[in-house]
């Protein structure tokens, strides 16, 4: 309240004003069920698994797709950055990502840079980290989860495939061998749409207790 002499006087209100923020942590158990497969969505990514044993047969195969460096590439492709660091963060992050490509997979150098790249996402939700920006965290994880859900839906509906497991940056499904090429085509179109790259692995069998306890047998 302003008085005639220009002095500001405080005034108490009968009904206190309350602001709500940070509500992204309210939903602790968000999930969807699609074709009898439950997908749990959360800050740590999407998760889901069908308990049991699944084996390759004469007519069906097990395909596993994994997003290459999902969290870093979502940030780089979509120009997502911690607000206080500015958009130049994306350029530096991309340079760091390209540096990793100079070293073969499995080498100490490659693994060290991979750890640094992925740590940015985790540290973006750490109050003691210079990367702290919860909005950045949510943009990355929601983008990744919805993008993967979109791809899983397309493969299940168009290929009549059955989801087996989904875990953070990838998923497995049981599919007729005659429809493998169709699935690969769907993935290729998805890659163009979202700007991410998928890595394919074929399994002979999967023995699943839950999303954190399973054994996969490679085809070769």
Walk through the language-model features, giving the residues of each.
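Conserved acidic
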Residues: 1-220
């Amino acid at each position: 309240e302003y008085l005639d002499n220009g002095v500001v006087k405080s005034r108490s209100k009968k009904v206190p004003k309350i602001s709500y923020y940070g509500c992204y942590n309210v939903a602790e158990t968000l999930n969807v069920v699609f074709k009898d497969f439950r997908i749990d969505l959360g800050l740590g990514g999407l998760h889901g698994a069908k308990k049991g044993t699944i084996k390759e047969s004469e007519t069906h195969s097990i395909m596993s797709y994994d997003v290459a460096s999902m969290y870093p590439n979502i940030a780089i492709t979509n120009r997502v950055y911690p607000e206080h660091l500015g958009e130049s963060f994306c350029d530096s992050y991309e340079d760091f990502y390209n540096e990793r490509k100079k070293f073969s997979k499995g080498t100490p150098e490659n693994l060290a840079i991979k750890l640094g790249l992925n740590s940015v996402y985790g540290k973006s939700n750490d109050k003691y980290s210079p990367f702290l920006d919860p909005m950045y965290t949510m943009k990355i994880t929601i983008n990744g989860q919805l993008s993967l859900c979109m791809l899983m839906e397309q493969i299940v509906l168009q290929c009549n495939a059955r989801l087996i497991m989904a875990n953070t940056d990838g998923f497995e499904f049981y599919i007729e061998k005659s429809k493998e090429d169709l699935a690969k085509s769907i993935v290729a179109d998805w890659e163009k749409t979202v700007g991410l790259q998928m890595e394919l692995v074929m399994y002979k069998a999967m023995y699943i207790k839950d999303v954190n306890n399973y054994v996969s047998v490679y085809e070769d």
